[in-house]
Amino acid sequence: PKKSRYLDKFSLSILEPQMTGLFISAIERIDNGGIGSFFIEELAELENAEISYDKPVQCNADVISHLNQEQQKAVNDVLNRPSLYAIQGPPGTGKTAVLSAIAKMYTDSGKNVLVICNSHQAVNNALNKISQYKIPTIKIGNEFKTVSLNEDIIKFSTMRQYSSFKRRNRMPTGEVVGMTLCGAILNLVLHGNAFTPSIVLIDEASQIPLCFGSAIAALAGGTYVFIGDNQQMPPIFHENLETDPLSISIFEHLQKILPEEL
């Protein structure tokens, strides 16, 4: 069989084996030519993988007119479609406003947007902000975690329900789908659902462990945008791994390897 470029370069400490097969499967998918290999190379610092750029998304000046200069720069940087980008800022600096403006202009260009966060509440907050632009916005997840969502957001408990709805209804090109990180791994990585985003917006990235990098890469986004606050509560790790050098958030790791991007 073909030898992986990646699997022999990782050292695994397995204390929670339930996800092991999933992560190995994700790396193998990427190794076989799937979108995301650049991301794995960047995270693991395996090669000098340069950030690539796709055809830019057109900027709508009206959408960003209410943003300050730094926020507008972040939006415009992402509209240039880099393969990897990170936005850092403490609470109250308008990170969600930037996220929603990016989602608006991507969907206006007919491109799918995936929003993932560590918690349902963070997903709901992001989707509520995005839905103010009156664009197709969908939340997938536990129905008991949708109480705080705006009424115009379409809600599904499972990806199967969403897929069935799309088959029965003519959906516009370019929509926003939001779910938790665990939901994205189960629905889009493990089950290989057909939803393919042009961009993946990862909020609360400072709470996501670095080990989830391989699964996030397998979400097949052309652009990955990590949004976080380096002063926010870090991920919680198994007590036997608290001193491990890899027991950090994916956002903290990005700050170390790509300081010029933050």
Task: Name each model feature, range by range.
Residues 1-76, 128, 132, 140, ...:
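Pre-ATPase regulatory/linker segments immediately N-terminal to the P-loop/RecA-like helicase/translocase core
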Residues 63-83, 97-98, 179-181:
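N-terminal pre-P-loop "Q-motif" helix
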Residues 71-74, 87, 94-106, 122-126, ...:
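Extended, hydrophobic alpha-helical segments in both membrane/secreted and soluble proteins
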Residues 91-93, 98-130, 138-141, 262:
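Conserved RecA-like ASCE P-loop NTPase motor core of nucleic-acid helicases/translocases
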Residues 108-111, 118-119, 182-186, 193-262:
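Conserved helicase motor core of SF1/SF2 NTP-dependent helicases
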Residues 111-112, 135-139, 145, 196-198:
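Residues that mark the start of a beta-strand
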Residues 123-125, 146-151, 233-237:
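Switch/connector loops and helix/strand junctions flanking conserved nucleotide-binding motifs
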Residues 149-177:
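Conserved motor-coupling elements within RecA-like helicase/translocase cores
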